Amino acid sequence: MLSWALIFFIIAIIAAAFGFGGIAVAAAGIAKILFFLFLVMFVIFLIMGLIGRRGPPPV
């Protein structure tokens, strides 16, 4: 049990170093760009799917 506490403590120290070091700001900027990129791609593929959809197959 003490080993798990030590592992999580080390992970917390590493996360704090990244968070307080300014890396989080850069990662948030990249995440915003990726969000809008994938949102635009979703809308494009949605429109393509609605336009290109054919009727039901013949029986």
UniProtKB/Swiss-Prot annotation:
It is found in: Cell membrane. The chain crosses the membrane at residues 5-25, 30-50. InterPro entries: DUF1328. It is a multi-pass membrane protein. Its main location: membrane. Keywords: Cell membrane, Membrane, Transmembrane, Transmembrane helix. One of its GO terms (cellular component) is plasma membrane. It comes from the Bacteria. Belongs to the UPF0391 family. This is UPF0391 membrane protein lpl2443. It comes from Legionella pneumophila (strain Lens).
